[in-house]
């Protein structure tokens, strides 16, 4: 129902304060025309009376003005003229004109009739002499003729009922009696309200108070009214309420438009609305765009998160933040929100992410760019050593597996040679003259690390050496001889290349070389 969250402000019906209200005279019986000799009671209303207070009455006739002081707030009168009353400290009331007539037929009407009231007109004959029929005219036109009721009732009176009224009475012997003319003017219950705003050109993010002001007449100051508020003729800002004020806690540029309010009686028979009021919400352009990082200073750690923070010093409304890298045309990210700052997270930063970054902010006046911030990426301590250690370990394990496979192969061949002695083709060739009768399989295998660089650069190698020695029958018994002293030594080199952190493929290459 509401475009944004609105709060109703509690306030009395707009108008004058109670101290400035005029007193109001009420008449009993409630007419303004009487026959001579009749008595009428006037009451001065509109303020609180105390026993010791008195009321001043003013009576103006053709001979002048007469003052009467009464101990209470009532006065009994029998003379024609204008009557006013005044209490201590109050202004004079509006005048009430009374007419005491000597005619045989009078038209009686109430002192005041307001729009929405029922207008009652009474055709009255002196001394209660009977009438057989009554005719009412309005501006010379016959309004009604009745032989049952001498009163005329006009419900829901309005200004359309203003005019000159008269009644004509008919007696038993076809006598005709004509009353005085009575001009009736229906009074306005309240004027069209006026919508007021604390600021018709507010800045975005501020509040605006709206008030729907109208004024009830003193005679009807106790009439309850309901109020509501609209925008652009359709958007309802509030339901009907007895409070004539509305607070808009926060306004934005889209809240600009034509505002108006309505006031009506509780019964809803009188409804009026105010002229429109244009409200233009002002937007402050963004300025002071700044790009920062978390961690601060543009110092990022490889593998960890980097947060790019884009902020503005000023600017209201929806702001679109966009992050960019100098060597890229496309935006890294974009966010639109009502705030002075926004964040973009880069989950795992890498060396390739180093470079110049900047951001822009735009709240419909065009993008404003920040200064370029240089982001550097440093390696995580221990990251390179870990890669080297892993590469070296992998190389050694590969060499060890190769040695085990070679021993197993020789064992299988030796076992096969025993079981097939009759097969000449499967026996090894006989040794030549002067040659020792050696086994073709090594008797001992030694794995030795030749070189490990704990701080390799890109392309560094890790070498491992596998030495195999073939022993004769005599030499097998002599275990004190070193492997490197044997002339028949087989050396296997294993080359392990380690990966530099920039190698995104994450591969470690290796190459075996036998000599």
Curated annotation (Swiss-Prot):
Phosphorylated on cytoplasmic tyrosines upon activation. A motif (ITIM motif 2) lies at residues 461-466. A motif (ITIM motif 1) lies at residues 449-454. The keyword Ubl conjugation does not apply. Disulfide bonds join 44-85, 123-167, 212-261, 310-359. Residues 20-387 are extracellular. Specifically expressed by memory and monocytoid B-cells which populate spleen and lymph nodes. Preferentially expressed in memory B-cells associated with mucosal tissue (at protein level). A motif (ITIM motif 3) lies at residues 491-496. Keywords: Adaptive immunity, Cell membrane, Chromosomal rearrangement, Disulfide bond, Glycoprotein, Immunity, Immunoglobulin domain, Membrane, Phosphoprotein, Receptor, Repeat, Signal, Transmembrane, Transmembrane helix. Residues 1-19 form the signal peptide. Residues 409-515 are cytoplasmic. It is a single-pass type I membrane protein. May function as an inhibitor of the B-cell receptor signaling. May function in the B-cell-mediated immune response. PANTHER family: FC RECEPTOR-LIKE PROTEIN 4, IMMUNOGLOBULIN FC RECEPTOR. This is Fc receptor-like protein 4. It comes from Homo sapiens (Human). The lineage of its organism: Eukaryota, Metazoa, Chordata, Craniata, Vertebrata.
């Amino acid at each position: 129902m509401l475009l944004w969250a609105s709060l109703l402000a509690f306030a009395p019906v707009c108008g004058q304060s109670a101290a400035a209200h005029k007193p109001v005279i009420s008449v009993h019986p409630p007419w303004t025309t009487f026959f001579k000799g009749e008595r009428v009671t006037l009451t001065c209303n509109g303020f609180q009376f105390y026993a010791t207070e008195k009321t001043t009455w003013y009576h103006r006739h053709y001979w002048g003005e007469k003052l009467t002081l009464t101990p209470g707030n009532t006065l009994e009168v029998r003379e024609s003229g204008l009557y006013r009353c005044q209490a201590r400290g109050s202004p004079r009331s509006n005048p009430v004109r009374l007419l005491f007539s000597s005619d045989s037929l009078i038209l009686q009407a109430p002192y005041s009739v307001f729009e929405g009231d029922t207008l009652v007109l009474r055709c009255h004959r002196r001394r209660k002499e009977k009438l057989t029929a009554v005719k009412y005219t309005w501006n010379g036109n016959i309004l009604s003729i009745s032989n049952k009721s001498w009163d005329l009732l006009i419900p829901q009176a309005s200004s359309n009922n203003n005019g000159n009224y008269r009644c004509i009475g008919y007696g038993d012997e076809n006598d005709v009696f004509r009353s005085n003319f009575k001009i009736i003017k229906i009074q306005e219950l309240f004027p069209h309200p006026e919508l007021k705003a604390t600021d018709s050109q507010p800045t975005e993010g501020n509040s605006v108070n709206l008030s729907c002001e109208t004024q009830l007449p003193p005679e009807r100051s106790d009439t309850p009214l309901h109020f509501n508020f609209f925008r652009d003729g359709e958007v309802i800002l509030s339901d009907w309420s007895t409070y004539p004020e509305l607070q808009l806690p926060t306004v934005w540029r889209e809240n600009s438009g034509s505002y108006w309010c309505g006031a009506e009686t509780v019964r809803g028979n009188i409804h009026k609305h105010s002229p429109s009021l244009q409200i233009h919400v002002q937007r402050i352009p963004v300025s002071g765009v700044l790009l920062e990082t978390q961690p601060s200073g543009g110092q990022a750690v490889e593998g960890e998160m980097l947060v790019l923070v884009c902020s503005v010093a000023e600017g209201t409304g929806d702001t679109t933040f966009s992050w960019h890298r100098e060597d890229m045309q496309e935006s890294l990210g974009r966010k639109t929100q009502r705030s002075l700052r926004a964040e973009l997270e880069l989950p795992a930063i890498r060396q390739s992410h180093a470079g110049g970054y900047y951001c822009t902010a735009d709240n419909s006046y065009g993008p404003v760019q920040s200064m370029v911030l240089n982001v550097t990426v440093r390696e995580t301590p221990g990251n390179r050593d870990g890669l080297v250690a892993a590469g070296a370990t992998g190389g050694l394990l590969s060499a060890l597996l190769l040695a085990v496979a070679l021993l197993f192969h020789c064992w299988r061949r030796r076992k096969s040679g025993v079981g097939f002695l009759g097969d000449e083709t499967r026996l090894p060739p006989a040794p030549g003259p002067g040659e020792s009768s050696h086994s073709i399989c090594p008797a001992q295998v030694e794995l030795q690390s030749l070189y490990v660089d704990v701080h390799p650069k890109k392309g560094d190698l890790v070498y491992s050496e596998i030495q195999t020695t073939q022993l004769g029958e005599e030499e097998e018994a002599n275990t004190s001889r070193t492997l490197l002293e044997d002339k028949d030594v087989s050396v296997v080199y294993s080359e392990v290349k380690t990966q530099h952190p920039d190698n995104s493929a994450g591969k470690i290459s290796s190459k075996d070389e036998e000599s």
